[in-house]
């Protein structure tokens, strides 16, 4: 059975997360239903990461095994036709080796988090940003973010229901920048690592937002990390500002990755 990699984009608002759930809409469920329309039968896809309720995908990657040796372009076109009207799109597809795995072959994952700073309701970006009414000190947040770089025990920044065998991870990048969005000034967090703990990125952002307001100092972030105690974490920010932006592999998988 040929195996295909799929690059997936989705708006997380109508879904209870990526993972298939009974009686709840999910991104995985939507794609598997579309697969059943082009090849009757039950299909199970595997993904590079299982995003939570409300979290978006810009470059999620999944794989599926099919009976037919599809042309990758025609496969993506067929799936997009049957995915309508769900806010899910297959933006690229590729034939891969049988042993290639969307999750286990990945060597890095990149997340983007968006904060919109404005008082008026965000009509166009509603559900796609974490909106706050106050300004943030980006330099202070970057100083706090720098405390988290490298290999650490991130117990403070993982959820109590995290199933990872170890809280030790290596954080390769946590970059904070101010940008001018269409709806107003935004702060973007660019986060990169091989893998993440459950709620790790949202815990980082919620904690750094406290630094940006002046409620915490950058050194407080270091103290929280060293505490190795979930109670030392700042607030966990909402999921709807979070995007799985990119998944990296040792060799380019999709034609769009080679451009």
Swiss-Prot record:
Its EC number is 5.4.99.12. It catalyses: uridine(38/39/40) in tRNA = pseudouridine(38/39/40) in tRNA. InterPro entries: PsdUridine_synth_cat_dom_sf (IPR020103), PsdUridine_synth_TruA (IPR001406), PsdUridine_synth_TruA_a/b_dom (IPR020097), PsdUridine_synth_TruA_C (IPR020095), TruA/RsuA/RluB/E/F_N (IPR020094). GO terms for biological process: tRNA pseudouridine synthesis. The keyword Transmembrane helix does not apply. Formation of pseudouridine at positions 38, 39 and 40 in the anticodon stem and loop of transfer RNAs. This is tRNA pseudouridine synthase A. It comes from Ruegeria sp. (strain TM1040) (Silicibacter sp.).
């Amino acid at each position: 059975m040929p195996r295909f990699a799929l690059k997936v984009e989705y708006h997380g608002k109508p879904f209870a997360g990526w993972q298939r759930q009974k009686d709840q809409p999910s991104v995985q469920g939507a794609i598997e239903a579309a697969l059943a329309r082009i090849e009757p039968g039950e299909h199970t896809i595997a993904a590079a990461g299982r995003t939570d309720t409300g979290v978006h995908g810009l470059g999620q990657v999944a794989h599926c095994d099919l009976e037919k040796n599809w042309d990758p372009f025609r496969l993506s076109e067929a799936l997009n036709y049957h995915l309508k009207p769900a806010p899910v799109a297959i933006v690229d597809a590729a034939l891969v080796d049988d042993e290639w795995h969307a999750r286990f072959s990945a060597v890095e994952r990149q997340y983007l988090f968006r904060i919109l700073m404005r008082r008026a309701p965000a009509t166009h970006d509603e559900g796609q940003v974490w909106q706050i009414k106050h300004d943030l000190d980006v330099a202070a947040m970057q100083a706090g973010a720098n405390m988290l770089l490298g290999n650490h025990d991130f117990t403070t920044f993982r959820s109590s229901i995290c199933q990872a065998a170890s809280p030790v991870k290596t954080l390769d990048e946590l970059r904070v920048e101010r940008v001018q969005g269409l709806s107003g000034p935004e702060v973007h967090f660019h986060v990169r690592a091989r893998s993440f703990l459950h709620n790790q990125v949202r815990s980082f952002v919620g904690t750094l937002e406290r630094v940006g307001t002046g409620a915490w100092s950058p050194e407080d972030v270091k103290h929280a990390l060293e505490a190795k105690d979930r109670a030392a974490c700042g607030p966990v920010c909402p999921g709807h500002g979070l995007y799985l932006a990119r998944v990296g592999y040792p060799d380019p998988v999709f034609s769009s990755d080679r451009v």
